[in-house]
Amino acid sequence: MICTFGDLSFASTPAAHTSSLDEQEVTLNFFGDWAPSSGRSQIGLQHRPDYLPETLSSHLNRSDLNVLNLETTITQGPATLRATTRLFREQPSALEFLKSHNFNLASLANNHVMDYLEVGLEETLKHLDSFSLGHAGAGFDRDTIYQPYRFEKNAEKISIICVADGELGNEKFNNGVGTADVTSFRVVDQIRKSKAEGCFTIVFVHAGIEFLPYPPPFIQDIYRNLVAQGADCVIGHHPHIVQGMEFYSGAPIFYSVGHFDLYREGGRTDERLGLMVSLGLLDAQLTKVNLLPFRIEEHNINLL
């Protein structure tokens, strides 16, 4: 396996042999919360040519699968429908950025996709479908809500299960409408089913306590249990900052990758830091882990 952070690389295989494997590897990139208009007086920044650094754009374009947490709704509906401190929404045109930068999957398992209730969720699903963008982790019935996103390439089979903790939009509080619950037995069922079908199984989780630099013990227990049930990797987001990672029973757990783009004027310094987690797969095994750190600025995103 190769583990990298920025430009640092640690390889367990000779460089020449590693290069010969690169063409066969399947590369997956994961990002945290994306709500580009949140906290900004100027919207539509994602359409600026300098919004992303060239290196990050290159990673996206070369990757086989790019995944983020869509921490917002895509709706042109009423100004407010849910009593909460902050309501997030983007115009459908925001999805042009995801499509043009080779994103394949938007996780909807989070605490903002239901900000505009069922109407907002329905519109979000409609607009994602209109851009041919995959989505998982939310819906109008439990079979759909807990259905993993499946991806296959070069004989690699990947299953991504998108789940969240028990906030207002969770399906367990809304009669089976809303977001997938990380503690549901259905998550374990989907992990076991995915593994039985030969999939490399990743659980993409929106959970935790905001602004804690380390995951609390109960989150560590939940994420480790996902691995114990068969998950090959767990990637977390929601705490607004980057937290630690570990290898547990051979599986990487990233407790929080921070934001992809969720800006708050006057916010904490650490909430402007994010990570791209890049995984390499070959023969159903994890061959590479690359962590690319970046900083969210008022008008764009810069690499560290």
Pin down the residues of each PLM region.
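Acidic, metal/ion-coordinating pockets
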Residues: 3-304
